[in-house]
């Protein structure tokens, strides 16, 4: 384990079992933030969320990530939790974490379908309606980060976009990590001219909580016109959800009132809310309007 903040909870809840728990904390080469060879940044998987949130270069050039890291849990947990662990954490679904023998634990059904589902997904659910709990993953996906993985078969690099697995492909895994593999570091590309990024999180409690609705934006401006865009949602789907419909709605246009209104409608395109979470549609529309308006200003 890295920081262990999620693993220990999973062991306590019976979601995972282990004959032994191995700490990675002694691997100093997996810790720290440094420049890479192309003008970007290399962030070790064991770097704490607090370190990510307050790093001057991240705050200046990768604002969405700094903000997302600062929004995770509480100060105590950010001091212990790591960036790699935040990417690889297990779902927070109360059926999965509870005593229910659901699909993800080898059962026959997702209990969120007919049960309490206020915090479950509105996009990408296919028989399993978890939401991915990470705040940093959407920000990293928006910023086109890559995950470096090492294991028994060697090293490989995976775009954050392709690191997570939808339930329709595999009920039992949240990421593409194989047996014996671990995340060594995350790499951010050099920021391009005109890049502005942000992360906004809506939660039930002001103190700390997981996202009901979250939005990571990375827009490249040429004057007032949006030249390129990556829009990624948290709290919406079993994986960090890239809203390509929203990107199409704003690229090539200035962020005027009409473009923002179109983007707000596009962000929930294809949404299929359950009985108790239709409110998320209004939340995502509101967050999109708020964040695009702020960037336009």
Model-assigned labels for residue ranges:
Residues 1-297:
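C-terminal structural segment of proteins
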């Amino acid at each position: 384990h890295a920081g262990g903040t999620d693993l220990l909870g999973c062991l306590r809840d019976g979601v995972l079992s282990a004959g032994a728990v191995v700490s990675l904390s002694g691997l100093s080469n997996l810790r720290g933030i440094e420049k890479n060879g192309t003008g970007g940044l290399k962030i070790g998987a064991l770097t704490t969320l607090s370190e990510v949130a307050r790093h001057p270069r991240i705050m200046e050039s990768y604002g969405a990530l700094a903000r997302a890291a600062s929004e995770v849990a509480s100060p105590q947990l950010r001091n212990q939790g790591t960036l790699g662990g935040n990417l690889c954490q297990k779902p927070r679904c109360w059926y999965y974490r509870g005593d229910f023998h659901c699909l993800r634990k080898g059962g026959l059904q997702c209990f969120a379908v007919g049960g309490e589902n206020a915090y479950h997904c509105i996009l990408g659910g296919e028989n399993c309606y978890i939401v991915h709990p990470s705040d940093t993953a959407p920000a990293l996906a928006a910023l086109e980060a890559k995950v470096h993985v090492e294991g028994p078969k060697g090293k490989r690099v995976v775009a954050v976009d392709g690191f997570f697995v939808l339930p329709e492909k595999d009920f039992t895994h949240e990421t593409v990590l194989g047996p014996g593999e671990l995340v060594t570091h995350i790499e951010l590309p050099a920021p391009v001219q005109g890049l502005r990024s942000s992360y906004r999180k809506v939660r039930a409690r002001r103190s700390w909580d997981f996202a009901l609705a979250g939005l990571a934006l990375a827009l490249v401006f040429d004057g007032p016109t949006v030249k390129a865009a990556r829009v990624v949602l948290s709290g919406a789907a079993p994986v960090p959800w890239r809203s390509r419909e929203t990107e199409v709605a704003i690229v090539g246009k200035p962020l005027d009132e009409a473009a923002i209104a179109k983007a707000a409608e596009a962000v929930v395109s294809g949404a299929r809310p359950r009985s108790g979470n239709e409110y998320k549609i209004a939340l995502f529309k509101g967050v999109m309007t708020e964040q695009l308006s702020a960037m336009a200003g």
